[in-house]
A protein has these predicted regions:
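Terminal disorder- and signal-encoded targeting elements
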Residues: 1-325
């Protein structure tokens, strides 16, 4: 429902300073009032609060567990077996487990902490690709999805970088436009064995987005990342307090919020998103302040909320739209 909804379009003489987008009912109301809005080409800032329920407890959500893949899981398992409870594990150029991650070991809880312990020159294989025009794709070109996971993942990363001109989120995984084979599965892949060197790999069956693969061996300087574990709790109840102190961004009960702010939060939980246009209502401002988002101007995401004995992930996003567009 819309609060403070105007009775009819005849009241457009009053300054209409805010609108709330609340599904179909809200859209209909906005359409009715559209004639009231000045078509001066001015921009309108829109704020969207997104929130999703996490179907795990805060303790379960905080604990890191390696997956079962050889590519990521095996190096992580090796690191944990060397680190827990009081060891060290060093890798060069990559981190096999998350920094600051929490793990459980024999009833106690530990936090993983990395330190840089030096650099070392070593020989590494680097994979680069060169675009091949579709009309020059050979009949024996290899479809990327037919490759084993380590090789396919690397080609897809290089494809993404090529298509974005180096502006994709995967660019940080590359070194001078090349992917360095570091993880054990990568160093045992078809790319590492030279089976794909000089071959053309396509991203689709039609031959679109084709690349010639180039694998070289170079001497590069790798950073030494050493991970250790620090015990933070000796029981689950103690660890829960650690999690709430370090991972939970907002802890609220329904009684702590004014009724109008609580209504907005419940609406966002039910629908996944709640949106307002600037200027924000007082109730929305109150809720954002309670969530620690009062000073956010553009975006904040990945936040965690404990509300009414449930765990949620939330974020705030804003964008500017042109009125009348």
């Amino acid at each position: 429902m819309q609060r403070n909804e105007m009775d009819d379009a005849g009241r457009c003489g009053m300054a209409l300073t805010r609108r709330r987008t609340l599904g179909a009912a809200g859209a209909t109301a906005l359409a009715t009032l559209a004639g009231c809005l000045t078509d001066d080409g001015s921009d309108t800032r829109e704020y969207s609060l997104s929130i999703d329920r996490i179907e795990r407890s805060p303790v379960e959500h905080a604990l890191y567990e390696p997956d079962d893949s050889p590519l990521f899981g095996d190096p992580a398992e090796t690191a944990l077996s060397n680190v827990l409870p009081d060891g060290r594990h060093t890798t060069y150029g990559y981190k096999p487990v998350p920094n600051d991650g929490y793990v459980e070991y024999e009833g106690s809880y530990f936090q993983l902490i990395y330190v840089v312990t030096g650099r070392q020159q070593m020989e590494r294989q680097l994979v680069r690709v060169e675009t091949v025009p579709e009309e020059q794709v050979p009949e024996d070109a290899i479809l990327v999805d037919s490759l084993e996971r380590p090789s396919a993942r690397i080609i897809k990363i290089l494809h993404s970088d090529s298509q974005s001109g180096g502006g994709s989120s995967t660019a940080e995984l590359l070194r001078d436009d090349g992917y360095v084979l570091r993880r054990p599965s990568e160093r045992e892949s078809r790319l590492a064995r030279g089976e794909l060197d000089g071959r053309v790999v396509t991203m689709t069956d039609s031959g679109a987005w084709a690349y010639r693969v180039d694998v070289t061996t170079e001497t590069i300087t790798e950073t030494a990342h050493t991970v250790m574990a620090t015990e933070v709790a000796t029981s689950q109840s103690e660890f829960r307090e650690v999690v709430f102190g370090s991972r939970i961004d907002a802890e609220l009960t329904p009684a702590e919020l004014p009724a109008d702010a609580r209504e907005i939060l419940d609406e966002a939980i039910a629908g996944g998103t709640y949106t307002e246009e600037a200027p924000k209502t007082a109730a929305f401002e109150t809720l954002l302040a309670a969530l620690g988002l009062g000073a956010v101007d553009t975006a904040a995401n990945g936040k965690l909320l404990w509300y009414d004995d449930e765990l949620y992930r939330y974020g705030l996003y804003s964008n500017t739209t042109e009125d009348g567009s």
